[in-house]
């Protein structure tokens, strides 16, 4: 990997190198490794996550070296730079008609793709459900047995270019029409109720104790989160600004399915 990384880093600093075969071959090799799940834009290292910046750079530089192509699928015509992912059956992936995954995204066995979209560089681990009209953005990292409900938007790193990908850890449940963008990290087995919107600047307020505890960019493991608001002063007066409220936790003493059901009932969370 060191030689690949060196080539990618050099091309990132000097885009003229994108005209050289050595560079384009290296970029395409990185994309192939991502597609196979052998290389990731971010990965767990111990109890932390490491962002592989050079891998993300390769994804960004893959676009300008690709040529536009036109192809047909039945009555539909497409004109794009990116190929689509193939080989779902032998990998044990269920793909419902109108689901789209780009080549360069890794999708593990046991994943179900309802009519949804998975962008290049993304990593979707085994047993995860990507429900109808959900979007998994470029380089986003989705763990095992995650449920991305209908209309969920998981942001990517390309448009605009972001420092870190969104990370959704194992067992998390992301409710309908949630938005998670700008490198937000959702911990294991967390539950986001419907319409929670998390950006890098969104206040996430734990209201389970005697005093509120504020954080940004990270939802702790097993947290149950709902949309909320807080009062902010502006020149024109005081107005409500959206935030997210941690109102409880999933209990680790029960299995995941029971814990999720109990959490939804106990806290009256819409999903």
Please place each PLM-identified region on the residue numbering.
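Structural signal for interior beta-strand "rungs" in well-ordered beta-sheet cores
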Residues: 93-233
């Amino acid at each position: 990997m060191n030689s690949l990384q060196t080539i990618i880093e050099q091309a990132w600093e000097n885009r003229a190198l994108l005209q050289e075969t050595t560079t384009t071959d290296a970029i395409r090799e990185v994309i192939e490794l991502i597609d196979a799940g052998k290389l990731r834009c971010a990965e767990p290292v111990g109890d932390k996550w490491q962002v592989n910046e050079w891998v993300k750079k390769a994804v960004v530089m893959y676009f300008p070296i690709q040529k536009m192509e036109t192809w047909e699928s039945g009555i539909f015509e497409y004109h794009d730079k990116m190929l689509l992912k193939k080989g779902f059956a032998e990998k044990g992936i269920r793909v419902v008609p109108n689901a789209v995954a780009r080549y360069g995204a890794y999708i593990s066995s046991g994943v179900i793709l309802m009519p949804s979209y998975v962008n290049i560089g993304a990593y979707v681990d085994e047993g995860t459900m990507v429900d109808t009209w959900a979007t998994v953005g470029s380089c986003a990292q989705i763990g095992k047995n995650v449920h991305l409900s209908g209309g969920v938007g998981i942001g990517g790193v390309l448009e605009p270019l972001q420092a870190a990908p969104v990370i959704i850890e194992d067992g998390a449940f992301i409710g309908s029409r949630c938005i998670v963008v700008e490198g937000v990290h959702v911990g294991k087995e967390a539950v986001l109720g419907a319409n929670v919107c998390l950006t890098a600047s969104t206040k996430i307020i734990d209201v389970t104790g005697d005093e509120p505890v504020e954080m940004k960019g990270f939802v702790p493991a097993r947290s149950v989160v709902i949309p909320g608001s807080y009062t902010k002063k502006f020149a024109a007066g005081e107005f409500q600004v959206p935030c997210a409220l941690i109102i409880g936790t999933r209990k680790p003493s029960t299995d995941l399915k029971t814990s999720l059901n109990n959490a939804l009932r106990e806290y009256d969370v819409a999903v």
